[in-house]
Amino acid sequence: MLTEHWLAWLYWNPPREAFTLPFIDHPVMWYGICFITGFILGYFIIVPIIALFVNQSKHLSSMDIQDWRSLVNQLKTSSSPLIQKCQNALNRQERQKLNSEIQPLNISSDLKNALLIKLNTILKENSIQRKDLEQAFQGAITSAKQISYFLADRLCWFIVFGTLIGARLGAVFFYDWNYFKSHPLEIFEVWKGGLASHGGALGVMLALFFYTSYIKKWTPTLSFLRVLDFVAIPSALTAVFIRIGNFFNQEIIGTPSAYPWAVLFAQPADGSLPIPRHPVQLYEAFAYLMTFFLLFTLWKKCNTCLAAGTYAGFLFIFNFSSRFLLEFWKANLDSILTNPILQMGQLLSIPFILFGICLVWRKQNWQNLFCCHR
């Protein structure tokens, strides 16, 4: 039966190296290109997501004030109705401090705190948005776009380190501990391969926890679950490119298949026989792509009207449910388990699915999910 479909199968044997860097003579792998492409695209997705959160935020901190001197001068001289409203909100003592700043080069911390309190009081009114204050105090209040780049730049570094460290340790402890316990120094040789997505997910979550603590001094209203939501949508897209990278590397291959769309991997990374198999890497990439479109559509419709953690919850449910099901079409991977009923990837997916259900299964979420519109 296998020979009947021979002409329909894709023979897959691309070079793992895309090119070699000049001068240092170091090969650049297709997997690395896919990995970096996913991160770069994810960065440009996460910036507008953060910008929307900043725009809708009802809190200003010292980070949001770009030029205190300009702010004070405009409060003293501008005839803008909104600025006049801010000025009228000041008490007598605060107005005296404001007017005493003849050359406001070194504005007192007391006056800064007082002005921030008044600006936040006005911002909490339903009719006032952050963009209104940005337009009124031109050049004095940092734009939401600038802040989103500031937050995204730092967030990406946390994600990169969390992904690499978590994915590497996940591969070491979940899949190949028997080897690495005898070769501990090789744990640091990440360039030789050996990354696990579940470990990467745990590493990113831990990194986001540290990021939230780090960023609190600038954005005290930003919670861990909200940051998790920021990362959810680009993570789904990044996962697509990672699986495409696995396809180039001929790793994480599927079980033997006689279907017309089967792929004959000529040089599987695990050294197995070059026979037609399910291109399970592409199955996963497609599933993650559908998750990305679903989350992106939901964000365009509801953005921040859903409770914090909802987008991350959907990501965990859909991505790891897909992973759980598609493991049945994957060739068995070495792991610390002996004669398991389920593969390691399936067992590790279950806690993420349950955590996702906990994040989504909240009453206010279902009300907002079907009522929000743009």
From Swiss-Prot:
Membrane topology value: Multi-pass membrane protein
One GO BP: lipoprotein biosynthetic process
Transmembrane portions of the chain: 33-53, 155-175, 195-215, 222-242, 279-299, 306-326, 341-361
Keywords: Cell inner membrane, Cell membrane, Membrane, Transferase, Transmembrane, Transmembrane helix
Molecular functions per Gene Ontology: phosphatidylglycerol-prolipoprotein diacylglyceryl transferase activity
Subcellular location, record wording: Cell inner membrane
Domain of life the protein comes from: Bacteria
Entry's EC annotation: 2.5.1.145
Residues binding a 1,2-diacyl-sn-glycero-3-phospho-(1'-sn-glycerol): 243
UniProt entry tagged with the keyword Cell inner membrane: yes
A GO term from the CC aspect: plasma membrane
Pathway entry: Protein modification; lipoprotein biosynthesis (diacylglyceryl transfer)
Family: Belongs to the Lgt family.
Role according to the record: Catalyzes the transfer of the diacylglyceryl group from phosphatidylglycerol to the sulfhydryl group of the N-terminal cysteine of a prolipoprotein, the first step in the formation of mature lipoproteins.
Stated name of the protein: Phosphatidylglycerol--prolipoprotein diacylglyceryl transferase
Species for this entry: Protochlamydia amoebophila (strain UWE25)
